[in-house]
Swiss-Prot record:
Disulfide bonds join C47-C123. The keyword Membrane applies. PANTHER family: E3 UBIQUITIN-PROTEIN LIGASE TRIM (PTHR24103). This is Erythroid membrane-associated protein. PROSITE patterns: B302_SPRY, IG_LIKE.
Amino acid sequence: MERPSPCGSWLVGCLFTIAVFQPPVQVLGDAGKVYIAPLRDTANLPCPLFLWPNMVLSEMRWYRPGHLPRTQAVHVFRDGQDRDEDLMPEYKGRTALVRDAHKESYILQISNVRLEDRGLYQCQVWVGNSSREDNVTLQVAVLGSDPYIHVKGYDAGWIELLCQSVGWFPKPWTEWRDTTGRALLSLSEVHSLDENGLFRTAVSSRIRDNALGNVSCTIHNEALGQEKTTAMIIGAPERGSLSSPAVALSVVLPVLGLLILLGIWLICKQKKSKEKLLYEQAMEVENLLEDHAKEKGRLHKALKKLRSELKLKRAAANAGWRRARLHFVAVTLDPDTAHPKLILSEDRRCVRLGDRKRPVPDNPERFDFVVSVLGSEYFTTGCHYWEVYVGEKTKWILGVCSESVSRKGKVTASPANGHWLVRQSRGNEYEALTSPQTSFRLKESPKCVGIFLDYEAGIISFYNVTDKSHIFTFTHSFSSPLRPFFEPCLHDEGKNTAPLIICTELQKSEESIVPKQEGKDRANGDVSLKMNPSLLSPQGSELFLLNDTWPSNLGPALKGLKVPSL
């Protein structure tokens, strides 16, 4: 058996040493290379580092050197997956990493390339605890519009030409060539940036006015290695041709003539348009007048119909009021519920507001905040109607409330809290205390208010006895005893001192409810309202506060209230 050659063993050992101490990541020849990508296209940036076979990539990061913050990356690849953390906001969702198996490396793809993406990119590769980085450059390029050539002017045998184009990046360069293909000298070059950061270019040159053939303008984009060319044909001049001013005049005069003809045509057209517009406006006005007449007739018919309906409603309300009066009851006031500032007559049918509180027992039934009083009657079934004389009072509250309403403290009056009330707030302004409140006006202010309760039907209606009209109706399903409610309200600077008076008998409407002087003959069937003498002189009555007196002229007014005989 032959022994191995010492030289062969040495060679194997050297190769093993090279393999062991060879770095896992090596630099390719692509380091520092410039890559070009069209605007809004996809850029491919190969990482200039490659891995030895069987080496496992731990992490790869792409950075923009010089961009802050340094910790944010363009793309992060770690543990075999793309990562979203620590990414620059402008690159999120636009990058991807593709494996280049041929070079044992990776390619960074940037979609929808922008001008701001151009510049230096750094690829950093980690294998275990070892890392290495190197750079590549991205250049963004845009091929602009086709060049446009036009004659800028004429000057002493020369024709000055201007070549323009827009939408280039990076800055292009322009080349003029004459009819023989020779390069022409550029007279001026202007390059500017538009709002999108792309270059506009305008380059001028000139040729002799006796030149014949094509003149071309070529704009080059060196980054893309592409160009765009436009040519202009120069015609042959005739012998003895006119001078430049004559040529200009020969061009200007026909154009001026065309402009004059065009102006005349436009004036005639505008005149016809105005006439047509005036005719259309006249027709529109005529149609509007006709429509107005029709609408006026329609509104007249509608108004006539509404008046008829209103007349029927008034007749129905009048009939309802007359039926309600068939259920008249004599209501009295309950002194145990009266607020301490209220003063009641001895027969408990009149109530007014005093100047101070009376020393009365603070029983549970008495109102201590709301200046009100309830009727003595409890209604749990049937129909009931009563009338209250309000006279010239400017404020009052009348209606019905549940026996269970709170008597202590401030209470919001509403059907939900067991109150079905109507209030005169000021002048001819009235409110039904619903939730929210319902405001309305009356054609004639009532001197006497009728209140009708139909317990089973769940109806509480208010009537103006003065003109026999309906005021307001509440509807509700009642389940507890109901009682009449009275509140004379504050004095209103002395204009509201008159009392609320419960009528002992039905009152006539219109003139008969106005108090008459004593001594005049009464109408047939009329009787005087019977009043207790203590109403005029309340001293000594347990229902009045000492030194509080009723007005001296109240007696004749109360005696003048008339009621019809039924």
